[in-house]
Amino acid sequence: MGMIFQSAALFDSLTVLENVMFPLDMFSSMNLRERTKRAMDCLDRVNLVGAEEKYPGEISGGMQKRVAIARAIALNPKYLFCDEPNSGLDPKTSLVIDELLHSITQEFKMTTIINTHDMNSVMGIGENIIFIYEGRKEWQGVSADIMGSTNKRLTDFIFASDLLKEMRQAVTHQK
């Protein structure tokens, strides 16, 4: 299983390449050349070739998240767990991370679980969505079903902003 934490959780004393190689060094039987190639392939996949000799403190938050993604997929996991992968990122970078997670999930045929409060992410890349309230599953479905949901807790959470409430009213009045 690969994991992406809310903070990128990178080792400050390791370069970008060394951070991605870390799980390979710990858990694979590959030789150094194979591990380096695999890590570079992962960095290429997240568009970070050229940053491999930099340290986490020398790169942006969005780049740090992409390093974390590269590290998480280095061992070709069947499952990927992401805890608030867009935390602290601007909307444009959040969209890049969402698109990257979605395409990697498809490409590597992984099951990806994303824990998030970002409704843009939920609506944009969520395929099977589970809304949990106080530790219990409150609602399950697909993003297209959210707009018409009658679950009060779900709709209160999703439509907390006035703009989203107006959008929902417009959609439900069109039916």
Question: Could you tell me what each predicted segment is?
Answer:
Residues Y55-I59, M63:
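Conserved ABC ATPase signature
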